Amino acid sequence: MENIQKLIARYPLVADLVALKETTWFNPGATSLAQGLPYVGLTEQDVNAAHDRLARFAPYLAKAFPETAAAGGMIESDMVAIPAMQKRLEKEYGQTIDGEMLLKKDSHLAISGSIKARGGIYEVLTHAEKLALEAGLLTTDDDYSVLLSPGFKQFFSRYSIAVGSTGNLGLSIGIMSACIGFKVTVHMSADARAWKKAKLRRHGVTVVEYEDDYGVAVEQGRKAAQADPNCFFIDDENSRTLFLGYAVAGQRLKAQFAQQGRVVDASHPLFVYLPCGVGGGPGGVAFGLKLAFGDNVHCFFAEPTHSPCMLLGVYTGLHDAISVQDIGIDNLTAADGLAVGRASGFVGRAMERLLDGLYTLDDQTMYDMLGWLAQEEGIRLEPSALAGMAGPQRICAAAAYPQKLGFGQALLDNATHLVWATGGGMVPEDEMEQYLAKGR
């Protein structure tokens, strides 16, 4: 306890985190893209290479997953305005939200119904391509739908993939790996939902369950993979490949904005609110958004009050050297996808200059907003996907933040607030009814 007091003396906001108070932190260390980019260690060329790789796999995906055929084998989600929800939030919180609120529906992405369909599937495809190229079975000029042939399935069955997950990443990696022909093991933490485990098993995935939290599942997955030279471990805490899979979202979103005639420039700022677990998904997306929109996009991460790992790590500068358990927080939350006690050190250090802020919200707030969104817009999400929904109201309530940016009222009226809905499209009906019953 003495150490916690010392930490609070240096970093006063830690007291609010320990007290499980809903907290908003605006990052005093935020810089321009030009200043912050070198610290990421990845470039626009890396993201373009990821984009090209996904394009090579598009013919394969279109055939392997017919639900992607209409989009030509591209796994991408809709972006919709949510005016009724915006009004409801204003009414519930008594706070005007300047500008327009939009929802990015990664919750309804093809194949696995969450943001993890971006990074998880991309990393599995990257590994498959590498193995096939090295074996001389494929060239980058080939039509990749050839990978559906029995010969390729047999080739990939000699290799295995392992991952540790709270649920959604395991779902995307498990389904994709099994489809390609890999043997795959998903190490699931205690908070993983039963339906996600059942779905994986139906796809022929080996699911190993733990009574412990996310960190233990990842560690055990890593250890198991080390014992087998043909096993590839997908490291959610440190993977640059996963990160790049998420980053591709930036250019695609820019194209969606153009299609819808929406402007993002110095007088039309874009604020984006991303739920954060270990950090790979929101970190990668935020990186891609910064490359696409430059200094006109402002990214915020949202975490449960019981799992504020990235806020704790970035705010103190301790990153992965501190966990929420170190300050007496239990890491137990209904937002299973965000139940992470120790943030990715890679993402925290890469992105700490490119984040405008982080905030926390409690489980009940997520349940309330889950219910309101279903009532007002007819859109059903899982609890973690609502974490971003509290963002616009937090930003609009904080006078000092727009002042610091030099944003007057006219600029705020032109703002777009994009809430990134991370999952929920595949939640079974009975489970969704239970979620809806918990909202007020």
UniProtKB/Swiss-Prot annotation:
GO biological process assignments: D-serine catabolic process; isoleucine biosynthetic process
Matching InterPro entries: D_Ser_am_lyase, Ser/Thr_Dehydratase, Ser/Thr_deHydtase_PyrdxlP-BS, TrpB-like_PALP, TrpB-like_PALP_sf
Enzyme category, top tier: lyase
Recorded catalytic activity of this chain's protein: D-serine = pyruvate + NH4(+)
Pfam families: PALP
EC number: 4.3.1.18
Domain of life, source organism: Bacteria
PROSITE patterns attached to this UniProt entry: DEHYDRATASE_SER_THR (PS00165)
Cofactor(s) listed: pyridoxal 5'-phosphate
Location of N6-(pyridoxal phosphate)lysine modifications: 116
Molecular-function GO term, any one: hydro-lyase activity
Keywords of this entry: Lyase, Pyridoxal phosphate
Subunit-level organization: Monomer.
Assigned protein family: Belongs to the serine/threonine dehydratase family. DsdA subfamily.
Protein name: D-serine dehydratase
